[in-house]
């Protein structure tokens, strides 16, 4: 054997040392001779991307998993290449064709925008000062077992962990999340911020200004001295802020608060309602009445904001029948009728007042199967103009003592609805982008649909372009004839307001165009023309206003609108 090795070495004379075989990877697969594991990985990624490009150019189907498996076997890789690694290796010429196949979590931008959630610093809930304590079910906050977390969060949710890593710096949170989405293959030309972490408007004004200023600066790249300057530069930035959502409470959603949020570029509010019963609000220590909820909905909508409510089934002393009746009232009573909904089934988490009730047997959650059934029945009640954003909290299951046992509650509820012959017709379920991703269905015959309803002392018109045969929603517009609660001087008098304009489908860059995508195909302009006709002919309004995201103001200027205060306004006479 030694002689054979020497001969193979090609040298003369003495015995040559044995050549060591390449180290096998996990599973016993041997790396190609002379390649380190890192070099083998780079070659495997290049081979996968090259094969994808070739198949795409020939118009053949691309089986990404098969290509990855073959490359891993050939190069003896212990771990398959990540999507982020493959996205970085795609040549510029092939990016348009290959990125949709490589995009991680495509649902992130299926609604046409990239959502960036950020958190303010930990602070105490404001109603401790008036009620002496927080809500009985609320975890987190500086006084809780999760002391470095914000109020109502544990610090272990994905958004919380990103915020903690950034030490709650708003600029770092926003910039790192945008860069992460970009690495995952998403278009981040259009960004919507969601401000989480408790009641933002209860924080000191100077901190709020610092936080908002840095969010806008993260998009524009400019270092601003104040919010007004930051908003101005953000309007012209390459990455557009098309909307901003702020979490608040009814007692921090009054006229002065609304005016301040408009100056920040805020377009949507998330308001904690939890229950439509006064006794439940009192027993759970909410610190406000249900009547206050109805009042703040009126004020918010008459200022043009979109309103998303948080509701909690399975609260103490409620029961199945009252829970279902509560949601029925929420959808049918004009005093509520929010534009969006987050359903948060009650969770028992250590350190809360509810945990103490659970320990002593004074509170028990619904059994898992019953909860799925209740959520299914709630989803069947949702009107077609309401969007269900979430169906459960993002709190990791190991931290939940009692309550929801599965992380896919929406999926289970939709399956139960199918068994019961029920259908969910909320906005999210019918969105074109969601339908394309989940069911590979694309709209065919598109028509304009109009729905009118009374809500919060005003006249609401929900305009949409839909494929009514397949029940697919392409775009929507929310138009309101304001009631008597107008607090903004720009809206006083005979004025109608567009509270939302949104065309669905995978995000397309602001100045881009893609014949295969639904955005930038003229649906938004058609919806605005119909809204102007209704405002002029039916509302008898003299002008129409739009609550516009800072980055979308140029779009409305092209349609003849001008900036007036925080709104884009057009005269109709």
UniProtKB/Swiss-Prot annotation:
Positions contributing to [4Fe-4S] cluster binding: 125, 135, 138
Region named Disordered: 1-31
InterPro entries from the UniProt entry: Acyl_CoA_acyltransferase, ELP3, ELP3-like, ELP3-like_N, Elp3/MiaA/NifB-like_rSAM, GNAT_dom, Radical_SAM_C, rSAM
Enzyme class: transferase
Keyword Lipid metabolism: no
CDD domains named in the record: Radical_SAM
Residues in Radical SAM core domain copies: 108-398
Residues covered by the N-acetyltransferase domain: 422-573
Keywords from the named record: 4Fe-4S, Acyltransferase, Iron, Iron-sulfur, Metal-binding, Nucleus, RNA-binding, S-adenosyl-L-methionine, Transferase, tRNA processing, tRNA-binding
Details of cofactor binding: Binds 1 [4Fe-4S] cluster. The cluster is coordinated with 3 cysteines and an exchangeable S-adenosyl-L-methionine.
Entry binding sites for acetyl-CoA: 190, 500-503, 523-525, 556
Name of the protein described by the UniProt record: Elongator complex protein 3
Organism: Oryza sativa subsp. japonica
